[in-house]
Swiss-Prot record:
InterPro entries referenced in this protein's UniProt entry, alphabetically: G_ENGB_dom, GTP-bd, GTP-bd_ribosome_bio_YsxC, P-loop_NTPase
Protein name (database record): Probable GTP-binding protein EngB
Binding site for Mg(2+): S52, T74
CC annotations in GO: cytosol
GO biological process: division septum assembly
CDD domains: YihA_EngB
Organism: Rhodopseudomonas palustris (strain BisB18)
Record: residues binding GTP: 45-52, 72-76, 92-95, 159-162, 193-195
């Protein structure tokens, strides 16, 4: 990819996410999913990894996605739709790995996520968010294994990069990239972001523009 193309995708991404983004749907079950239309990308990650904050930072909207300091608060698939002519949606998935939730609730979330991943033809990519302070955990590996089997394109995004020292961030990257080598279905490029500073947001938006271009 040339620098000119990278700059073009970054600018197109800026324009797309500067547009009007709205909440359109909340699905507590597969039966209540919205009709499939256009392309969708979903954000998965452990509880409190920063999914809602990332969506807000991407769209430049402080309160588009609700953020919570209570782990496991998001219990539904939350859909956001971009500008009318974009035909593009973001999906905030329920956080996983919250051990204090009732077992029945965890089973329900797990079933919802697995069924969504395997039955949504409009789902172009899943972005798996990993907290840069903690790196890949066993529960993340379990989710990556599920994604390997689901035939859905996925890419790992480090969040909260501003909350670790540069040397720790560099080591986290090395460790996560090593872990990803066990998952050949993973997109090879690791993205590093901070919702607080905006670092990595242009590159993440550009990645989605490339995805739209590939699927159009």
């Amino acid at each position: 990819m040339t620098q000119d193309n990278d700059a073009k995708f970054i600018e197109q991404g800026r324009k797309l996410f500067a547009g009007d983004w709205q909440f359109i749907w909340a699905s507590p079950s597969i039966e209540t999913l919205p009709p499939m239309a256009g392309l969708e990308v979903a954000f998965a990650g452990r509880s409190n990894v920063g999914k809602s904050s990332l969506i807000n930072a991407l769209t430049g909207r402080n309160a588009l996605a609700r953020t919570s300091h209570t782990p496991g608060r998001t219990q539904e698939l939350i859909f956001f739709e971009g500008p009318e002519n974009a035909n593009f949606r973001l999906v905030d998935m329920p956080g996983y790995g919250y051990a204090s939730a009732p077992k029945a609730k965890i089973a329900s979330w797990t079933s919802l996520i697995h069924n969504f991943l395997q039955g949504r033809s409009t789902l172009a990519r899943v972005y798996v968010l990993i907290d840069a302070r903690h790196g890949l955990k066993e529960v993340d590996q379990d989710v990556l294994n599920t994604l390997d089997k689901s035939a859905v394109s996925y890419q790992v995004v480090l969040t909260k990069a501003d909350q670790v020292k540069p040397a720790e961030l560099a080591q986290c990257r090395i460790d996560v990239e090593a872990g990803l080598r066990k998952h050949p279905a993973a997109y090879p490029e690791l993205l590093v972001t901070s919702s607080r500073t905006g670092a990595g947001m242009p590159e993440l938006r550009a990645a989605m523009i490339k995805l739209i271009a590939e699927r159009s």
